[in-house]
A protein has these predicted regions:
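Short "domain-exit" segments at the C-terminal end of structured domains
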Residues: 236-240
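Small-residue (G/A/S/T)-rich helix-start motifs and N-terminal tracts that mark the onset
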Residues: 1-81, 90-106, 111-235
Length: 240
């Protein structure tokens, strides 16, 4: 609903049947699993198929293990646009110099994941989110950082854009996964990675805003609300 063209999910074989009947709107790339998670065969499978796709998103539903580290490193060594979320952010820290790649990488951490990625203590990030986001974006100029907190900080090459659209409903588990998906869709439609990140965070926050009751709000409501948005054109957002 956010405008993505075609989508392929690379998943452990043990959950492929469930996903196959859940929706008709994506394709599946099955990988042998081990104890319910990716086996080491996932590394070769990604290598063999990565050139079939323009954007690679990694992290959602994965775990902190060596397979995740290897998959993230392989993706970052490619010439593809990459979106990192969840445990892929932890994995990226293991070889963080790869974030200095020439192609776009968009990272979507919440505060704890930002701590995993950078090694900066959670309390420091909470007290100085603007500065932490700005400094990170200066050190990794090809990256666009979307730092999620009560406010959202979108940082690129030392410029920070602040989305002040607080919504308690977005603290619910799964909301960040939906943002990651919208980011992927926008990255496929916008030539500029910063514009993609700005549009995605706006769509995400405004879709959630249509549900006033944060107590009954569910993350899938964001998806259902996207067609109901009356979007404004974001041409030159205000920098801070």
């Amino acid at each position: 609903k956010s405008g993505i063209g075609t989508l392929t999910l690379m998943v452990p074989e043990c959950i492929s049947n469930v996903l196959a009947i859940k929706s008709d709107f994506y394709m599946l790339l099955q990988c042998a699993d081990r104890n319910g998670i990716f086996s080491s065969k996932a590394i070769d499978l990604l290598k063999q198929n990565i050139n079939n796709y323009s954007i690679i998103s990694i992290g959602n539903g994965m775990q902190k293990n060596n397979i995740t580290i290897a998959l993230v490193e392989q993706a970052l060594k490619s010439d593809k646009k990459i979106v990192l979320d969840a445990d892929a952010l932890w994995a990226a820290q293991k070889n963080i110099e790869l974030l200095k790649r020439s192609e776009t990488t968009i990272l979507t951490p919440h505060i704890k994941e930002m701590s995993d990625l950078t090694g900066i203590h959670v309390s420091t990030i909470l007290s100085n989110p603007f500065e932490v986001a700005r400094d990170f974006s200066k050190e990794y100029p090809s990256c666009v950082l979307i730092l999620k907190s009560s406010q959202t900080y979108i940082a690129h090459q030392g410029n920070v854009y602040v989305l002040d659209a607080q919504n308690a409903g977005l603290a619910k588990g799964g909301s960040g996964d939906i943002l990651c998906g919208i980011v992927v869709a926008m990255l496929g439609q916008c030539k500029d990675s910063l514009q993609a990140a700005l549009c995605a965070t706006y769509i995400h926050s405004q879709s959630a805003k249509l549900d006033i009751d944060s107590a009954s709000f569910m993350p899938e409501d964001i998806i259902n609300n996207i067609p109901n948005l009356s979007l404004i054109h974001i041409s030159e957002p205000t920098r801070q």
